[in-house]
Swiss-Prot record:
GO biological process: tRNA modification
Protein name as catalogued: tRNA dimethylallyltransferase
Enzyme Commission number(s): 2.5.1.75
Stretches the record annotates as Interaction with substrate tRNA: 33-36
Top-level taxonomy: Bacteria, Thermotogati, Thermotogota, Thermotogae, Kosmotogales
Cofactor: Mg(2+)
Length: 308
């Protein structure tokens, strides 16, 4: 028995098909999305609607407030706990989303017992303040694999990887390889033609703005959350903050959201190429009924066809 994981770029249509699939087999979704974890951020993160949630239960969304820290350690723990709860109910857990980092965390495992080291962390932060860019250079020396994987602007993860190294004497990358996740996942990747995906992104962003994205960010501001928070760096929110602060027009902010989302989708697609053994389903070349039949068959085969 293996665990199905359905991945796909943003706006590819994962939720749409999973909700329909839920009428055919008893599934529940464990979200693999690093932004839907935040409360009060519904429109910009494209969370399932109330209607969709009434048809298909989703786990690991609305987990923390926008100003709370949340890392891959906590995600993996909560996600696997949710999976166990779904299995106990006699239903099939389906991991679904687009976060490559969260997917890697589930499939490769992480070391959960490396404690936070505030002394090392503060020393690293001070070093970066005094010599900007120094932590990236340091990471390249001590953990080149992590250096290649972590975005240059992701200071939080850079500090964590260095923190683990200076605390344990071993790189987090090497520790992750030792502590493999015992659960075996089978990956199914949903894809679309590039032009079609770009068009879907354009339409989705327009719909987000029409549905109240600006008002959602205004509410976050009124609740006391600030644009400097990690959660507010999310595509869709960062650009609207710029609009609210008078830095760009609404038209320009919308254009930036579309552009940045397209770029993000391209990065996701490149990331998913690493899963050589994954089954790939083209949503552009297959009709809806056939897609649902394929997903149903694949999930039941992966799960062993046993549920209930």
């Amino acid at each position: 028995m293996k665990i199905p994981m359905i991945l796909g770029a943003t706006a590819v249509g994962k939720t749409q098909f999973l909700v329909k699939l839920a009428s055919l087999i008893p599934i529940e979704v464990v979200s693999v999305d690093s932004r839907q974890i935040y409360r009060y951020m519904d429109i910009g993160t494209a969370k399932p609607t109330r209607e969709e949630l009434s048809k298909l239960k989703h786990h690991v969304i609305d987990v923390v407030d926008p100003d709370e820290d949340f890392n891959v350690f906590e995600y993996r723990k909560i996600a696997l706990k949710a999976m166990d709860e779904i299995v106990k109910k006699g239903r099939i857990p389906v991991f679904a989303g687009g976060s490559g980092l969260y997917a890697e965390t589930l499939m490769k495992g992480i070391v959960e017992n490396v404690p936070r080291n505030d002394k090392v962390r503060e020393a690293l932060k001070t070093l970066e303040v005094n010599a900007p860019g120094s932590l990236r250079k340091l990471l390249e020396k001590v953990d080149h694999e992590a250096y290649e994987k972590i975005h240059p602007n992701d200071l939080k993860r850079t500090i964590r990887y260095l923190e683990v190294f200076f605390t344990t004497g071993k790189t987090l990358t090497s520790l992750q390889k030792i502590h493999k996740c015992s659960n075996q996942f089978t990956v199914i990747i949903l894809e679309r033609d590039r032009r079609e995906l770009a068009e879907r992104i354009e339409n989705r962003v327009d719909k987000m703005v029409e549905s109240g994205l600006i008002e959602e960010v205004v509410r976050l501001k009124e609740m006391g959350y600030t644009r400097e928070l990690n959660s507010q760096q999310t595509i869709g929110y960062a650009e609207i903050w710029s609009y609210l602060e008078g830095e760009v027009t609404l038209e320009r902010a919308t254009e930036l959201i579309k552009r940045n989302t397209r770029r993000f989708a391209r990065r996701q697609i490149i990331w998913f190429r690493r899963y050589k053994d994954a089954k790939r389903i083209s949503l552009s070349e297959t009709n809806e009924n056939d897609i649902l039949s394929l997903l149903k068959e694949d999930i039941l085969n992966v799960w062993g066809g046993k549920y209930g």
